[in-house]
């Protein structure tokens, strides 16, 4: 039917390309031996992009994702903090992902890099509240668009909030399953810590990094799916898990308490006068700034935990309170139970009237 008809060279080339494409597709469909492969010179970049798309935020301040010292953070997002229960007090989580070969350990440089990221986040946060340089356009932009995050430094106790920081590495299940699995790594070092002073969790120089393994085949399959709901559900699940696992790690190392000053006790004045004894151990993470969080290292490296608790109990109501829990209900019960000891002021004591009676002999 097309005899004696003429076609341009471009049309013939297009026909040949289309024929080659559909012929190959047909052969692939008919032959199980023909497979497609993904070739990557540096698979770390591919894995990093997969994880960032699945757990990260994209609306990140430029000074955090691309830091002033030239370092580029792999993953960052805001989520509920470790030390509080309020949803309206988000904190930045910092992550680093690597596609490690089996048996490969995380190097010292990678750990140091994560600690540096955390220090930079702290400084960026403080600049939002303490730097008024109107000529710094980036700072003013961040203040306007990211000023909803709480201040990491507590002015009353001079303590610092805990920065969540983690490694996430790929792992293949032994049976090569696509099961959704993410867990604390089975390597020797499940977490890393860095501190200048012992027994000061709420110190600016006390930093931590946790390490998780994720089923590589699952995240690749999830990344490739055109299913926004599944991806969002996994993101929510993983963020919640990261927070809880870091809290578990901290709870294994520290005893956490909540404390509130006795009536007629000036908490701010007391903490200022006993600054050296409480520095790095006390922080105010709650909306009720009359309630403080106290963290003491279980190993008691200074050998004075009990002495400090005894002294603090002379001035504060103190209860056991797991990290991130709301202490208001329990501490209110303690205050109500004990307030009779503190209810009367000197003025009220002077106004008391003693009433009695004497039995008559008649």
What are these regions (language model features)?
Residues 30-361:
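Catalytic core segments in nucleotide and nucleic-acid processing enzymes
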């Amino acid at each position: 039917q097309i005899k004696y008809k003429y076609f341009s060279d471009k049309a013939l080339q297009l026909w040949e390309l289309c024929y080659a494409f559909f012929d190959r597709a047909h052969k692939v469909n008919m032959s199980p031996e023909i497979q497609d492969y993904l070739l990557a010179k540096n698979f770390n970049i591919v894995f990093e992009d997969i994880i960032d798309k699945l757990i990260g935020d994209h609306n990140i301040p430029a000074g955090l994702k691309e830091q002033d010292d030239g370092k580029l953070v792999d993953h960052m997002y805001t989520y509920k903090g470790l030390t509080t229960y309020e949803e309206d007090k988000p904190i930045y989580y910092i992550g680093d992902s690597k596609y490690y070969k089996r048996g490969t350990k995380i190097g010292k440089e990678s750990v140091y890099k994560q600690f540096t990221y955390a220090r930079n986040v702290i400084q960026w946060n403080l600049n939002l509240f303490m730097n008024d340089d109107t000529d710094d356009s980036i700072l003013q932009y961040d203040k306007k668009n990211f000023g909803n995050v709480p201040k990491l430094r507590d002015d009353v106790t001079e303590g610092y909030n805990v920065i969540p920081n983690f490694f996430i590495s790929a792992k293949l299940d032994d049976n090569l399953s696509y099961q959704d699995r993410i867990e604390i790594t089975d390597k020797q070092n499940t977490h890393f810590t860095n501190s200048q002073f012992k027994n000061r969790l709420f110190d600016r120089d006390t930093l931590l990094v946790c390490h998780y393994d994720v089923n590589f085949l699952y995240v690749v399959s999830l990344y490739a799916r055109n299913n926004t709901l599944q991806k969002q559900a996994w993101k929510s699940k993983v963020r919640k898990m990261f927070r809880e696992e870091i809290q578990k790690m901290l709870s294994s190392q520290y005893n956490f308490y909540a404390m509130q000053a006795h009536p007629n006790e000036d908490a701010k004045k007391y903490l200022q006068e006993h600054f050296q004894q409480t520095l790095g151990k006390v922080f105010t993470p709650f909306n009720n700034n009359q309630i403080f969080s106290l963290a003491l290292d279980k190993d008691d490296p200074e050998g004075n935990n009990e002495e400090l608790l005894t002294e603090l109990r002379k001035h504060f109501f103190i209860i056991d309170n797991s990290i991130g829990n709301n202490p208001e209900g329990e501490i209110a019960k303690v205050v109500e139970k004990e307030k009779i000891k503190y209810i009367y002021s000197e003025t009220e004591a002077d106004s008391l009237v003693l009433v009695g009676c004497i039995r008559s002999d008649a």
